[in-house]
Structure formats: structure tokens, C-alpha cells
Amino acid sequence: CGVRMMHNDGSDALESRRGLPGPMTAFYKMSGLCARFPYHPRLGHYYMSGMTWDEPGKIEVISGAFCMLRHVALDNVGLLDEDFFMYGEDIDLSYRILKGGFENWYVPTRILHYKGESTQKSSFRYVHVFYEAMLIFFHKHYSGLSMVISIPIKMAIMGKALMSLFSMMIRRAKHSLGFFDRPPKPLSFLFIGAESCMTEFKRIARENGLEAKFIVGTEQDLPKGHLSPGLEISGNCCVVYDTDSYSNSSIFKIFGSRPQPGVEMGTYSKQNSTVITMGGIYQ
């Protein structure tokens, strides 16, 4: 089974549940039709967007970022295929699990997923490995298709890869000519926790040069956290919760109830006086 993965702004990660990239589903994904019509039962099948987020349900592909697998299923269908590297192996394994007579399920238990932090998506190697994985999957499971179907699929995959490379080359050329994107507004911090945490919060902010505000609150007396009436939060803000004052499930529920672009999630552990955010670790 797979779970409900969240981005660090509280929004749901679409790859929490996916459909098998069969010939037409893959074509819709590569051609952009899936993104254009995400809730269409056929065009948007890759992300299974017609499913509710709050209830368990059968899916076709579980994410390799976080999943639980039965030992008996792996004994029957085998482990990850080493022909893949980094991408595609979870789709391949999910397909083999289904072919082995088992089921894949989505469970709405939330986890925080720092997506893409283990890869550099602006590299040529990323583009090569990512799209090569799609071709490996296609050759492995759909090699028997007629050329009338297979050629457009391969062209869509390679076309998407070329577009990604071209876009990357343009960005690098602009940088080499001295054109840079406008720097983002500096990240500010909002620390929320019990009164006993305030001294340590202020020390961490001071020693790490963080622009910060501090709110005394717990799950009991400030249940809505940073979404409470009267708290004004602008973009590019990291809200750090003390995990002794707020459970992880409560933090996820608060962020998930109203995701805000630029408002990120952070956590503070009293046991080791450490703040963890997507952008760094502070002590």
C-alpha cells in the first residue's frame, strides 16, 4: 500500500496514487493532456485524480518514496528490477504485483515528502535517466505492440526529453550571459510552541541569523496553529512547530487544510534542540 504524501506546503503529492502508464495513458502524460484535463477519467488516469483523498481505495501504482509490501508478494513477483536506476522501478514492481494476483492500495495516512531533494533536476543526467526509465518500462512490458501504437509513444517520450533538455540549455545560456531570475524574498520564520520552548527558539534564530517571530501555543489552546484568526503570514515563511506541543498528525492536518504557496513546514525537536526544514537543519 501507499500513503498520502504531502509537499512541505501541505499540498497533496499527485504521485501518491497513480495509474499504470499503459500506451495511451503514457501518451496522455507525455503530451500534456493529463495536466490539461487532470480529472478526466481517461486523460487524467495517470494520477487517478477522480479518487477522493480521504478514503482508502485500490490503485495501480504505489510510490517508491514510501510504501509497505507483503513479503509473500515479493517472494512471488521478485524485488526491484536493477535495469532501472532511481526512476521507474516502483511502477515496474507495482505492475508485477498486479500481474501476480495481488492488489495495490492507497491509504490516506499523511506523511511529509521532501520530493526531489535527492536529485538535481537541472542536470543532463537527470533528464537522461528519467526518460530512459520510461523507455525501459515500455520495452519490457509493451514490446509486443504494433508499430502503429509504439512509435507515437516512443516519439512522445523522446520529444518530452528533448523539450526538457532544450529548456535547460536556454536557462544555462541566459545565466552565462548574465541574466538571472529575480532572487526570492528572504525566508522568514514563525516558531510556535509551548512557553518552555521560547528561550531555545530565540537562541536558534539568533545564532543562525534567522528573521523570526515567536508564538506561544499548543495543540490544546491554539488548535489551528498558524491558521488561527489574527495571525498574518506572508509568502516565503517557514512555520516551525514544536513536536511536543503539536503531534505530527495535527501539524499535517493544519497545513493540509489550507496549503499556501510560499508557506513551508518545519519541525522542532526538544530532545536534541534541532529545527528541520526543507531548506536546512538548524541547531
Task: Spell out what each predicted region is.
Residues 1-19:
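Conserved donor NDP-sugar-binding/catalytic core segment of glycosyltransferases
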Residues 95-171:
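Active-site-adjacent helix/loop segment of glycosyltransferases
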Residues 179-283:
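A solvent-exposed beta-alpha-beta segment
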